[in-house]
C-alpha cells in the first residue's frame, strides 16, 4: 500500500520515510484482517481529507512547480492548509515559510569586515578624486582659450604665450599622474572587496542552507540551490566590484563639473541643470521596471536549473528511455519564459540609455542658445561659456557612463533578495542552535505518544494517526508493513527531521523538542535505504561518522584504527583493501564509483564507527546481496546488543530476532510482538512472511546456516586475495587499453579549452546562435553606426559654435551674427538629439531580442549536447551534476558579453574613432596625426586588460565550480548531512575553498587594475600633447581656432569613448571564456553518440542476447577490472536472473546491454548482431530498464510515465493499462489530483515503493522486447513486492527479461539463473538445478531462509 508523500527515498535530498497509503487493494484489506471495501478511498484520516475540497483545488494547485505551492494557493485565495485546525496549520507553516526580505543596495555589504569597509572607503575616495580630476581639465581649457584669444589680439608676446602653453600642458601631466594613482587604488580595491564580500555571502548562504529544516528542502530543488550559490552570487559580486568604482568616478566627475560651472556663471548653469533632472527622473522611473523584469527572469532560470540538475543526476535513466529530447523540451519551457522577461528588461534598459543620450545633445542645444545671449549682453566671456559647456558636457557624458552600471546594481539587488531571504530565515529545527537541554547520560528509551503527522509539503494527506509506540532501551524494535505505511516517518520523527502536528516523541522520558537538536542527532546513527556518500575518500566517508563525538579529536592513528575496525565490522574492509588505492580511493559524487552494496557497507561502517547509543536502520541491508547481507546482518545483530535499535525491513528474514516487531498499515500500528508470537496469531505479519517464503527446497536448520556464515567469512577473505592476485598480468595489459581510451578524450578536451580557439572562431560560435536574427542584427548594426556617428558630428557642431561665439561682439552687427549663427547650431544639435534618440531606442530593442535568444539557444544547445554525451563523460570527477548545472546557468549567461549591447557599444566606438579621425585629418592633418598617435596606446591598454581578465576568469571559474559542486553535493544530500551533524564540517571545508580562491586571484586583480588605470590616465596625456602641439601650430599661425577645436574635440572625445570599450572588458573576458568552454563541449563527440544516424536500424527483435568473453573496466577507474571474460546466453523470451555478491559485475552487465559503455574486449550480441554495430537510439527503443533507484522528475505522475513512451500521442487507456500492470493504478486514482498529481523534485512526494511502481509502469508503456530489471523490487515491501512481482512475471511473457536480484525469492521462477563472482559466471541453471548442485547459489539461498526463529 502506498503513500503520497513519503518516499523521499530517491536522492538523499528528498529521502525519508513512508507515507500513508491511499490505495488499498481488496486483497490487501483481507490480508490485514479487514472486510473488502469498494475501491473508493475510505474516510479514515489516512486518506486525503475532504475530498471535495481537493477536487476544486485540482485546477489551481501546482501551476508547474511545487516550490511555489503554498504561495500560489494563497495568491489564488485558496489555502492548502485551510482544512486543518489552527495549531496544526501553525506547525506545518512554520516548517515551510520563507519570509520575504526587502533588500536595499547597501545591504549587499552586510558581510563586509572592518578591513573591507576601510578599503572600500579608501577605494571610494580614490574613485571620487579620480573622477573629480577630469572636469578640472576644463578650467585649464578655459584658461588656454583665453590665452589663445589674447594671442590672436596680440595682447601678449609669443614668448609669454609659449610659457603659458608649457605651464598648462604640465598641469595636464600632473592630472594624468593623479588619475593613474587614484584609479588604480579604486579598481583594485573594489575588485578585491567585491570578491571577498561575495565569498562571505556564498559562505553564509551555504551555512544558512545547512541549518534549514528538511521540509524546506522538500519544496526547493537542489538545482535551485546550485543556481543561487553560483549564478546569483556571481551577479551580486558583479554589482559590488569594479562597477561601484566606475560609477562613483562618473558621479564625482558629474558633480565637480557642475561645481566648476556654478563658479563660472550660476545663471547659465542653472538653466542647463534642467537636463540633469530629466536624466535622474528617467533613470529612477525605469530602473524599477528593470528590477521587476529581472527578478522574473531569474526565477524562471532557477526552475530550469532544478530540471537540469534532476536530469543530469539521473542521466542513465534519460539515456535508457531515449528521453533526451523530451527532457530538453521540459527544460526549454522554463528558458522560454525567462527569455520573455529578459527581453523586457533589456529593452527597457535600451530605452533608458536612448533618453539619456537625447538629453545630452539637447543640453548642448540649450547651452549655445542661451550662452550666445549672455555673451552678447556682455554678462560673460567666451572662455567662461566654453568652460561651462565643456564641464556640463563632460558631466553629462559621465552620467551616461553610469547607466550601464545601474543595470548591474539593480540585478545584484534582485539576485540578493532570494539569497538573503534564506540566510535570514529562522529554521524551526535549527541544528546549529545552542538552545535546548542535553542529558547527562542516554539510556536510549524512546517513546512515541499519540503521534499525528502530516508532511508540510503535502498538507492534504495525514501520514500517521494516533500512533503510540514504546522502543525499550537496549532492545531491537523492527518496523514492517507495506510501502507508505509510516515506517520511515517514525525514523524521521526520532531524528527530528520534522515536527509532528500532534503528540510527542520522548527520549528517556524527555520531550525531544526540548532537547538540543545537534546533541540529539549525535546520539543517533542512521543508515538509510539509499546510502549517500560524499565525493571524498572511503576513509573520509567513514570518518564523517566521528563528527561531534568524543573520538573526533583523537590522534590520526587512533582514528585510522577506529575506521578500519568499523569497516571490518561492516564486512567492507576486504573489498576496500582490494581496491588499488585502498582506503584512499575516491568514491566519486554520491559514491557512484561503487556498487550499491559497497556503498551500503561503507554507510554502515560510518554509522557504527562512533559506537552510537541509538541505531536507526532504514532498510540498511536492502542494497546488499545475500552473501554480504548475511555477514553484515550478523554484524548488525551483534551491534544491536546493548543499544536501542529501530530496524525497518522489507526483507523479513533480517528481523526475525528482534525483541519487538511492529506491523504498520496506513499510518497506524496493526499488531506487535515477537516473530514467533506474531506467526501464531496468523494475522498481518503471518501474511507478510508467507508472501516472502522461499520455495520448499531449503528446509535447512539454523545450525547449518550459522556454519555457512562462519565459513563464508573465511571464504570472503581468501576469495578477495585469490581473485585479485592472478589478475596482475591481465591488469597491466588491460590498464593500457582502459587508460588510453578514457584519457585521450580528457587530454583532448583540456588542450582545446586552454589554447585551441582563436577569438574569430569563438565569435563564429556566437554568430551561429544568432543566425536567425540576421535582420535584427543588421538593424542593430545600422543603429550602432548612427549612434557612433553622434560623437564626431557633434565635434563639428561644437567647433562651429565655439568659433561663432569667439566672433567680435563689440558692434551690433557682430552681435547679430553671433546670435544667428549660435541659433543655427543650436537647432542642429536639437535635430541630432532626435536622431540619436531614435537610433538608441531601436538598437536597444533589437539587441535585446538578439542577446536573449542567444542565451536561450546556447543554454538549450549546451543542455542537449550534455545529454548527447556518453555515460563515461558523466562519470568524470569534473562533470558532476552540480558542476554541469552551474556551467549551464553561468557560462551561457556570460556569452551575452559577445552579443547585443556589448557588440553594439564596440561597433559604436569603432565608428566614433574612424569618423573622428577622418574628419580631423581632413581638416588639419598635422594636429590630427599627433593626437591620433596616442590612440593605439589607449587601445593596447584596453586589450591587455581584456587579456588579463580572461585569464583571471578562467581560474576563478574553475575554483568556484569546484566549490559550487561541493555545496550542491552537500545540499542535495541534506538528510545525510543532518543525521551526521556534518553542517560545521561542510561549512568549514567550503570556507577553505573560498579563501584559497581569493588568495589566488589577488595578483590577477592587481595586474589588471594597473593596466586599466593606465588606460584611463593616458586620456590626460593625449590632451596635454594635443594642447601643446595645437598651441605651437597656432603660434606659428598654421591653424585657426576652428581647426584647433574641431581636431581637438573630435580626437579627445573619440579617445574617451574608446575608453568605454574597456569597461566592457570584464564581460568580453567572461564571454570569451564561456564561448571557449561551450565550443569545447559542442566539439566533443562521444564514443557512443545518441545523435548519430549511423549503425544498423533493427526492424524487429527476437531478443536473443549473448555475451562473448567480455572484459570491461570503468573509464574512470581503468586499473580496476570489473568483467573478466564474461560469457552468457539468453534465449528469446527467457526470464534470466543474475545473482552474486556486490561488485561482481551484475549491474555492469545491464549497463553494457543498455550500451552505456562498450566492452574493452569481447562483444555483446543481440540476435547475432554486435550491439556496437547498431544504431544506438533504435537499439535502445527495444529495451526498457527498471533500475534499483527509481528516477522521477519534477512534474506530474502522467508526465513521468509518458517518458517511457517511444511515440507521441499515447492514448490514456495505454497509460492506465501500464499502471494497472504495475499495480499502481488504484493508488494514483486515490490521489487528490490522480494522474495530474505533482511528484516533487526527484519524486520526493512519493514513497520508494510508489516511485518504483511508477518506474515500472513507465517501462511497460514502451512494450519492450527486452526488459532489464536491476533490483526492480528492492524498494518494495513484501505485499507490494508480491503483487509487482506477479505483474513483472506477467510482463515478462513474450519478451526477454534479465533481472538482477538480491532477494532470491523474486527470481525462483526464472528460466535460467547465472551466478556471478569476480566478473564472470561461476554457476548457471534453474533454481531447482542449482539447489541440487549445493554450490554458491545454494549457499546464498540458505542465507536468506525465512523459517521460524528457533
Curated annotation (Swiss-Prot):
One MF annotation (Gene Ontology) recorded for this entry: ATP binding
Family statement drawn from the similarity comment of this UniProt entry: Belongs to the ABC transporter superfamily. ABCB family. Multidrug resistance exporter (TC 3.A.1.201) subfamily.
Usage in biotechnology: Liamocins have high bioactivity against the pathogenic bacteria Streptococcus spp. and can be potential new specific inhibitors of oral streptococcal biofilms without affecting normal oral microflora. Liamocins are also able to inhibit human cancer cell lines such as breast cancer cell lines T47D and SK-BR3 or the cervical cancer cell line HeLa.
Gene3D superfamilies reported in the protein's UniProt record: ABC transporter type 1, transmembrane domain, P-loop containing nucleotide triphosphate hydrolases
ABC transmembrane type-1 domain mapped to chain residues: 121-411, 779-1070
One example of a Gene Ontology biological process annotation: oligopeptide export from mitochondrion
Biased composition regions of type Basic residues, renumbered to the chain: 52-63
InterPro entries given in the database record: AAA+_ATPase, ABC1_TM_dom, ABC1_TM_sf, ABC_transporter-like_ATP-bd, ABC_transporter-like_CS, P-loop_NTPase, Type_1_exporter
Main location, first listed in the record: membrane
Organism name: Aureobasidium melanogenum (Aureobasidium pullulans var. melanogenum)
Listed name of the protein: ABC-type transporter MDR1
Amino acid at each position: 500500500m502506498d503513500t503520497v508523500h513519503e518516499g523521499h527515498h530517491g536522492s538523499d535530498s528528498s529521502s525519508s520515510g513512508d507515507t500513508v497509503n491511499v490505495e488499498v487493494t481488496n486483497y490487501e484489506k483481507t490480508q490485514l484482517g479487514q472486510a473488502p471495501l469498494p475501491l473508493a478511498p475510505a474516510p479514515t484520516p489516512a486518506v486525503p481529507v475532504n475530498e471535495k475540497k481537493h477536487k476544486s483545488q485540482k485546477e489551481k494547485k501546482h501551476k508547474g512547480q511545487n516550490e511555489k505551492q503554498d504561495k500560489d494557493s494563497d495568491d489564488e485565495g485558496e489555502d492548502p492548509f485551510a482544512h486543518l485546525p489552527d495549531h496544526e496549520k501553525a506547525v506545518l507553516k512554520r516548517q515551510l515559510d520563507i519570509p520575504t526580505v526587502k533588500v536595499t543596495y547597501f545591504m549587499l555589504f552586510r558581510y563586509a569586515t572592518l578591513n573591507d569597509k576601510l578599503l572600500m572607503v579608501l577605494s571610494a575616495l580614490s574613485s571620487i578624486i579620480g573622477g573629480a580630476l577630469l572636469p578640472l581639465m576644463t578650467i585649464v581649457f578655459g584658461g588656454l582659450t583665453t590665452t589663445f584669444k589674447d594671442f590672436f589680439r596680440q595682447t601678449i608676446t609669443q614668448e609669454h604665450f609659449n610659457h603659458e602653453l608649457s605651464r598648462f600642458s604640465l598641469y595636464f601631466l600632473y592630472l594624468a599622474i593623479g588619475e593613474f594613482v587614484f584609479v588604480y587604488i579604486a579598481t583594485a580595491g573594489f575588485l578585491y572587496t567585491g570578491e571577498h564580500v561575495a565569498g562571505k555571502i556564498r559562505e553564509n548562504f551555504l551555512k544558512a542552507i545547512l541549518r534549514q529544516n528538511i521540509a524546506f528542502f522538500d519544496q526547493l530543488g537542489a538545482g535551485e540551490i546550485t543556481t543561487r550559490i553560483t549564478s546569483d552570487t556571481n551577479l551580486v559580486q558583479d554589482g559590488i566590484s569594479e562597477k561601484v568604482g566606475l560609477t562613483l568616478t562618473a558621479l564625482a566627475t558629474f558633480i565637480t563639473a557642475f561645481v566648476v560651472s556654478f563658479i563660472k556663471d550660476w545663471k547659465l548653469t542653472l538653466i542647463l541643470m534642467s537636463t540633469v533632472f530629466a536624466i535622474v527622473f528617467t533613470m529612477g522611473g525605469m530602473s524599477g521596471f528593470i528590477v521587476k523584469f529581472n527578478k522574473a527572469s531569474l526565477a524562471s532560470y532557477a526552475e530550469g536549473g532544478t530540471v537540469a540538475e534532476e536530469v543530469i543526476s539521473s542521466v542513465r535513466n534519460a539515456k535508457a528511455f531515449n528521453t533526451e529530447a523530451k527532457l530538453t523540451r521540459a527544460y526549454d519551457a522554463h528558458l522560454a519564459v525567462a527569455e520573455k522577461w529578459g527581453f523586457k528588461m533589456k529593452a527597457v534598459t535600451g530605452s533608458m540609455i536612448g533618453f539619456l543620450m537625447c538629453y545630452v545633445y539637447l543640453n548642448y542645444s540649450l547651452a549655445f542658445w542661451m550662452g550666445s545671449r549672455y555673451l552678447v549682453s556682455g554678462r560673460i566671456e567666451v572662455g567662461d561659456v566654453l568652460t561651462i559647456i565643456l564641464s556640463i558636457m563632460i558631466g553629462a557624458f559621465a552620467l551616461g557612463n553610469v547607466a550601464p552600471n545601474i543595470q548591474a546594481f539593480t540585478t545584484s539587488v534582485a539576485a540578493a533578495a532570494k539569497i538573503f531571504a534564506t540566510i535570514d530565515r529562522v529554521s524551526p529545527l535549527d541544528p546549529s542552535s545552542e538552545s535546548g537541554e542535553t542529558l547527562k547520560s542516554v539510556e536510549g528509551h524512546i517513546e512515541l505518544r499519540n503521534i499525528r503527522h502530516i508532511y508540510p509539503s503535502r498538507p492534504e494527506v495525514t501520514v500517521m494517526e494516533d500512533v503510540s509506540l514504546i522502543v525499550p532501551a537496549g532492545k531491537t524494535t523492527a518496523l514492517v508493513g507495506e510501502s507508505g505505511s509510516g515506517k520511515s516517518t517514525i525514523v524521521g520523527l526520532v531524528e527530528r527531521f520534522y515536527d509532528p502536528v500532534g503528540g510527542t516523541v520522548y527520549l528517556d522520558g524527555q520531550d525531544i523538542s526540548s532537547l538540543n537538536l545537534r546533541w540529539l542527532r549525535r546520539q543517533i546513527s542512521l543508515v538509510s535505504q539509499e546510502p549517500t556518500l560524499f565525493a571524498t575518500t572511503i576513509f573520509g566517508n567513514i570518518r564523517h561518522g566521528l563528527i561531534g563525538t568524543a573520538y573526533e579529536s583523537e590522534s590520526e592513528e587512533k582514528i585510522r584504527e577506529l575506521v578500519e575496525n568499523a569497516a571490518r565490522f561492516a564486512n567492507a574492509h576486504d573489498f576496500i583493501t582490494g581496491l588499488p588505492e585502498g582506503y584512499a580511493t575516491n568514491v566519486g559524487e554520491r559514491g557512484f564509483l561503487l556498487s550499491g552494496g559497497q556503498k551500503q557497507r561503507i554507510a554502515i561502517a560510518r554509522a557504527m564507527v562512533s559506537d552510537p547509543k541509538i541505531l536507526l536502520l532504514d532498510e540498511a541491508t536492502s542494497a546488499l546481496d545475500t552473501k554480504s547481507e548475511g555477514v553484515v546482518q550478523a554484524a548488525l545483530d551483534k551491534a544491536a546488543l546493548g543499544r536501542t535499535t529501530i530496524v525497518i525491513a522489507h526483507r523479513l528474514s533480517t528481523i526475525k530476532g528482534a525483541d519487538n516487531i511492529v506491523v504498520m498499515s496506513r499510518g497506524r500500528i496493526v499488531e506487535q510482538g515477537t516473530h514467533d508470537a506474531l506467526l501464531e496469531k496468523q494475522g498481518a505479519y503471518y501474511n507478510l512472511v508467507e508472501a516472502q517464503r522461499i520455495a520448499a527446497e531449503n528446509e535447512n536448520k539454523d545450525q547449518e546456516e550459522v556454519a555457512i556464515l562462519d565459513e563464508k567469512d573465511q571464504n570472503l577473505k581468501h576469495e578477495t586475495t585469490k581473485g585479485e592476485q592472478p589478475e596482475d598480468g591481465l591488469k597491466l595489459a588491460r590498464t593500457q587499453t582502459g587508460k588510453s581510451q578514457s584519457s585521450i578524450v580528457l587530454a583532448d578536451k583540456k588542450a582545446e579549452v586552454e589554447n585551441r580557439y582563436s577569438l574569430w572562431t569563438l565569435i563564429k560560435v556566437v554568430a551561429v546562435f544568432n543566425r536567425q536574427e540576421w535582420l535584427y542584427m543588421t538593424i542593430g548594426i545600422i543603429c550602432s553606426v548612427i549612434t557612433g556617428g553622434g560623437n564626431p558630428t557633434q565635434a563639428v557642431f561644437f567647433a562651429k559654435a565655439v568659433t561663432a561665439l569667439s566672433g567680435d561682439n563689440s558692434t551690433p552687427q557682430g552681435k547679430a551674427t553671433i546670435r544667428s549663427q549660435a541659433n543655427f547650431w543650436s537647432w542642429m544639435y536639437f535635430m541630432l538629439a532626435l536622431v540619436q534618440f531614435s537610433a538608441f531606442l531601436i538598437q536597444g530593442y533589437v539587441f535585446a531580442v538578439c542577446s536573449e535568444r542567444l542565451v536561450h539557444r546556447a543554454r538549450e544547445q549546451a543542455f542537449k549536447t550534455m545529454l548527447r554525451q556518453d555515460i563515461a563523460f558523466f562519470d568524470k570527477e569534473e562533470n558532476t551534476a552540480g558542476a554541469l548545472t552551474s556551467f549551464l546557468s553561468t557560462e551561457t549567461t556570460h556569452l551575452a558579453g559577445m552579443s547585443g549591447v556589448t557588440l553594439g557599444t564596440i561597433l559604436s566606438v569603432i565608428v566614433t574613432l574612424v569618423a573622428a579621425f577622418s574628419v580631423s585629418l581632413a581638416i588639419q592633418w598635422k594636429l590630427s596625426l599627433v593626437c591620433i598617435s596616442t590612440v593605439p596606446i589607449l587601445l593596447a591598454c584596453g586589450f591587455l586588460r581584456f587579456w588579463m581578465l580572461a585569464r583571471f576568469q578562467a581560474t576563478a571559474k574553475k575554483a568556484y565550480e569546484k566549490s559550487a559542486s561541493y555545496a550542491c553535493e552537500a545540499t542535495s544530500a541534506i538528510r545525510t548531512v543532518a543525521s551526521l551533524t556534518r553542517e560545521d564540517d561542510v561549512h568549514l571545508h567550503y570556507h577553505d575553498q573560498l579563501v584559497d580562491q581569493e588568495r589566488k586571484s589577488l595578483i590577477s586583480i592587481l595586474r589588471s587594475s594597473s593596466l586599466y588605470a593606465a588606460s584611463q590616465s593616458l586620456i590626460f596625456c593625449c590632451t596635454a600633447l594635443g594642447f601643446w602641439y595645437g598651441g605651437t601650430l597656432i603660434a606659428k599661425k598654421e591653424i585657426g581656432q576652428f581647426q584647433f577645436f574641431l581636431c581637438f574635440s573630435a580626437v579627445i572625445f573619440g579617445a574617451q569613448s574608446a575608453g568605454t570599450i574597456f569597461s566592457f572588458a570584464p564581460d568580453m573576458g567572461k564571454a570569451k571564456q564561456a564561448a571557449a568552454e561551450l565550443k569545447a563541449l559542442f566539439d566533443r563527440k562521444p564514443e557512443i553518440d545518441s545523435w548519430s544516424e549511423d549503425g544498423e536500424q533493427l526492424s524487429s527483435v527476437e531478443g536473443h542476447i549473448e555475451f562473448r568473453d567480455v572484459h570491461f573496466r570503468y573509464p574512470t577507474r581503468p586499473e580496476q577490472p570489473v568483467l573478466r571474460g564474461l560469457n552468457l546466453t539468453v534465449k528469446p523470451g527467457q526470464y534470466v536472473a543474475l545473482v552474486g555478491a556486490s561488485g561482481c559485475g551484475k549491474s555492469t552487465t545491464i549497463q553494457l546491454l543498455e550500451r552505456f559503455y562498450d566492452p574493452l574486449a569481447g562483444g555483446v550480441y543481440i540476435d547475432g548482431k554486435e550491439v556496437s554495430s547498431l544504431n544506438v537510439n533504435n537499439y535502445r527503443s527495444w529495451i526498457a530498464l527498471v533500475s534499483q533507484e527509481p528516477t522521477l522528475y519534477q512534474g506530474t505522475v502522467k508526465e513521468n510515465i509518458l517518458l517511457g513512451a517511444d511515440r507521441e500521442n499515447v492514448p490514456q487507456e495505454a497509460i492506465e493499462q501500464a499502471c494497472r500492470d504495475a499495480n499502481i493504478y488504484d493508488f494514483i486514482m486515490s490521489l487528490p489530483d490522480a494522474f495530474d498529481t505533482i511528484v516533487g523534485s526527484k519524486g520526493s512526494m512519493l514513497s520508494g515503493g510508489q516511485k518504483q511502481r511508477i518506474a515500472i509502469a513507465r517501462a511497460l508503456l514502451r512494450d519492450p522486447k527486452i526488459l532489464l530489471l536491476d533490483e526492480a523490487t528492492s524498494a518494495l515491501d513484501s505485499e507490494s513486492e508480491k503483487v509487482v512481482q506477479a505483474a513483472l512475471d506477467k510482463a515478462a511473457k513474450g519478451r526477454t527479461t534479465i533481472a538482477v536480484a538480491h532477494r532470491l525469492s523474486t527470481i525462483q521462477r526464472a528460466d535460467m539463473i547465472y551466478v556471478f563472482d569476480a566478473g564472470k559466471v561461476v554457476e548457471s541453471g534453474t533454481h531447482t538445478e542449482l539447489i541440487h548442485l549445493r554450490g554458491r547459489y545454494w549457499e546464498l539461498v540458505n542465507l536468506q531462509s525465512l523459517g521460524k526463529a528457533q
